């Protein structure tokens, strides 16, 4: 690999603004804001609007749209079509 062309891959904390959850992971993204982690070390923090802690798909609070009504409406409208 060439030296000097790859981004820095370092530990970063992602903070979910909706739920307040924090995740320590590694990333190439960086920030001027920092946070002190549970281990006493200071890491750059990236604020995200939504994560797996607050997204309805992952929390189980998703709404499932009822498409059966639309299918039934379509079938009743076109049941005699082509006969």
UniProtKB/Swiss-Prot annotation:
Keyword Ribonucleoprotein recorded: yes
GO terms, molecular function: structural constituent of ribosome
GO CC annotations, alphabetized: ribonucleoprotein complex; ribosome
Keywords linked to the UniProt accession: Ribonucleoprotein, Ribosomal protein
Protein's UniProt keywords contain Ribosomal protein: yes
One of the protein's GO biological processes: translation
Organism, as annotated: Leifsonia xyli subsp. xyli (strain CTCB07)
PROSITE patterns, sorted: RIBOSOMAL_L31
Pfam families associated with the record: Ribosomal_L31 (PF01197)
Family the UniProt entry places it in: Belongs to the bacterial ribosomal protein bL31 family. Type B subfamily.
Protein name from the UniProt record: Large ribosomal subunit protein bL31B
Gene3D superfamilies from the UniProt entry: Ribosomal protein L31
Subunit: Part of the 50S ribosomal subunit.
InterPro entries given in the database record: Ribosomal_bL28/bL31-like_sf, Ribosomal_bL31, Ribosomal_bL31_B, Ribosomal_bL31_sf
């Amino acid at each position: 690999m060439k030296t000097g062309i790859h981004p820095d891959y370092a530990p970063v904390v992602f903070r979910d603004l909706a739920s307040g959850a924090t995740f320590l992971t590694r990333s190439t993204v960086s920030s001027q804001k920092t946070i002190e982690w549970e281990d006493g070390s200071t890491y750059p923090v990236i604020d995200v609007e939504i994560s797996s802690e607050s997204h309805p798909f992952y929390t189980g609070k998703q709404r499932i749209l009822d498409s059966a009504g639309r299918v039934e409406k379509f079938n009743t409208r076109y049941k005699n079509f082509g006969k």
